[in-house]
Regions:
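A residue-level marker of the well-folded mature domains of exported/periplasmic proteins
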Residues: 13, 22-343
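Sec-dependent N-terminal signal peptides of Gram-positive bacterial secreted proteins and lipoproteins
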Residues: 2-23
């Protein structure tokens, strides 16, 4: 299994995701893929046995925020591996961008109309996704992954405590700068649950350490828009910004590119996700750090929880996926840990 995980991740980093073959028609979306393969006798991990396989070829739909990013590619890979291990069909799809809320709602409704056996959603906007999922409550397992939503009767949430994880980065920067330091935050979608939780964790830990947060702006979760946002911040606060705390690694990369284009190399930039692209920049001295989630495990565990629920097993209402701060001190060890999966 470890070798397979490594190969899957390497493929994600090398090429953009392509739709996999399916034993049934794929959902009507250009950003959809499905996996349906025989159950594997190999355990999901060394510490956790594979749950009992489904008695038939169940179909689990996973609607992510998008498939057009490195991070969500890792989540999809985890879902695909779970499909292999449990011998089920898993449809993975998502809108063209995380800002496409109405497109995601339509995808959720489409999957429910196909009479799937369970559905897992990473909501672009929590209330919109919850509204689309409400008719499924009590009929099939309904789970959230990465980003939670308020929905009475939902089965479970699988993901990182975003506020607590972001606080790791905020405290690190506060300790580095010392009291009186100045920072800015580049958040994701304004008002979106994950973005607000991470922003809260950043700001509270920075302010507790005596750091002034000069401003917070949205980078829309992408490198190019975050680059433009950082350009604006640099123009408004010349020679003041000492650190930037970002919603995700794409945001951090955009901020770093803006700094580089302006000949600035002394601003500490923190990302969030633990993507290899960001860790490589940490080792190159261009990023200060990233808060590593475990997106592959997150996708795997979400499908695993859905299978358990279909099988009638009791699952926890919250299934946590731990995060850790990656800096230059442990970046190589983090990459070595990934590489060791192939052994």
């Amino acid at each position: 299994m470890k070798k397979l995980i490594s190969l899957v991740l390497a493929g994600i980093l090398a090429i953009s995701l392509a739709a996999c073959g399916s034993s049934q028609p794929a959902p009507a979306s250009s950003s959809a893929a499905s996996s349906s393969v025989p159950a594997s006798s190999e355990p999901a991990s060394s510490s956790q046995p594979v749950p009992k396989p489904a008695e038939k070829d169940y179909t689990v739909s996973v609607v992510l925020k998008t498939l057009s990013s490195e991070y969500w590619g890792y989540v999809k890979a985890g879902c695909d591996k779970a499909a292999q291990d449990f011998g089920i069909t898993v449809n993975v799809l998502g809108p063209a961008a995380e800002s496409e809320i109405s497109e995601q709602v339509a995808q959720i409704e489409q999957q429910l109309s196909a009479n799937v056996d369970a559905i897992v959603v990473a909501p672009c906007e929590s209330s919109a996704a919850a509204g689309a999922l409400a008719p499924a409550i009590g009929k099939i397992p309904v789970l959230f992954v990465d980003t939670d939503a308020e929905l009475e009767g939902k089965t479970s949430f699988v993901g990182t405590g975003n506020k607590e994880a972001a606080a790791l980065g905020g405290k690190y920067i506060a300790d580095k700068l010392g009291k009186g330091g100045k920072a800015v935050c580049i958040c994701g979608q304004l008002g979106e649950a994950t973005s607000e939780s991470r922003l809260s964790g950043y700001k509270e830990s920075l302010e507790a350490g005596g750091i002034t947060v000069l401003d917070t702006l949205s980078g829309q979760n992408t490198a190019d828009k975050s680059m433009a946002t950082m350009e604006d911040l640099l123009a408004r606060f010349p020679n003041e910004i000492q650190a930037v705390l970002c919603h995700n690694d794409d945001t951090a990369i955009g901020a770093q590119q803006a700094c580089e284009q302006n000949g600035i190399d002394n601003i500490k930039i923190i990302g969030f996700d633990g993507n290899k692209s960001a860790v490589d920049l940490i080792l190159a001295g261009k990023l200060e750090g990233t808060i590593a989630q475990q997106p592959f495990q997150m996708g795997y565990m979400a499908v695993e929880a859905a299978v358990k629920s279909i099988n009638g097993e009791k699952i926890d209402p919250v299934i946590p996926v731990p995060a850790k701060l990656i800096t230059k001190d442990n970046a190589q060890a983090y990459l070595d840990e990934l590489a060791s999966m192939s052994k």
